[in-house]
A protein has these predicted regions:
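Conserved short alpha-helical segments that host acidic/polar catalytic motifs at enzyme active sites
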Residues: 1-201
Length: 201
């Protein structure tokens, strides 16, 4: 299990993000993480919460994390959110789910080009990093999220934070097999693809 939470605000989102993630603490017992975007770019904090509550581990980080856009998670598996820099720009990403065809997707990623993954304990690959690698195979974040939706066998919720979300040429926000909304600076892939962009209600 696990839980994700995101905030898009006109002012500081840090306290809302902190309490929103803490509310999900019952969904996981291993890792907690927060990532915010503000005037100084991205800032992130991840802690092990196996032996102490989320609030205790993150109460000092709240003073240093400044921004009006933020995502975070409680995770039973991999440390996240991850900060990614690629040809699509910089973004933060967090996921919750189970990828049944993970080995197949990793083999395809290796076959498609020069790519590597950070290895976790026990030889496992961070599923969130795999999702980011799938997104980065396309020409826009929107197309990448749609590709994730098509490729993953299993259950996957993706919360993605990008300073600016670009759309592929000629497609607008509506695309086959997905519905879209625009809100804040968060891109979210649920059962249907929902897209959120800054500055729109």
């Amino acid at each position: 299990m696990g839980g994700v939470f995101g905030v898009a605000s006109k002012s500081s989102c840090t306290m809302d993000l902190f309490f929103g993630i803490d509310y999900h603490s019952h969904l996981g017992t291993r890792r907690g993480g927060m990532a915010v975007y503000g005037p100084n770019g991205f800032n992130r904090s991840i802690h092990n919460i196996e032996n102490s509550p989320f609030r205790t581990k993150f109460e000092r980080d709240v003073e240093e994390l400044e921004g009006n856009l933020g995502i975070g998670c409680i995770s039973d598996m991999e440390p996240q959110p991850l900060l990614i820099q690629s040809h699509l720009g910089s973004f933060a990403i967090t996921t919750v789910g189970k990828i049944n065809n993970e080995e197949e997707l990793v083999r395809e990623a290796y076959a498609n080009g020069h790519i590597h993954f950070m290895e976790m304990s026990g030889g496992r690959i961070n599923a969130t990093e795999l999702v980011a690698a799938l997104i980065n195979q396309k020409d826009s974040l929107v197309e990448g999220l749609q590709y994730v939706h098509e490729k993953i066998d299993g259950s996957m919720t993706v919360l993605l934070l990008a300073p600016e979300a670009s759309t592929p040429p000629g497609t607008g926000w509506a695309a086959p097999r997905c519905s879209s909304e625009k809100r804040g600076g968060l891109l979210c892939l649920l059962r249907e693809l929902r897209i959120y962009q800054p500055g729109l209600q």
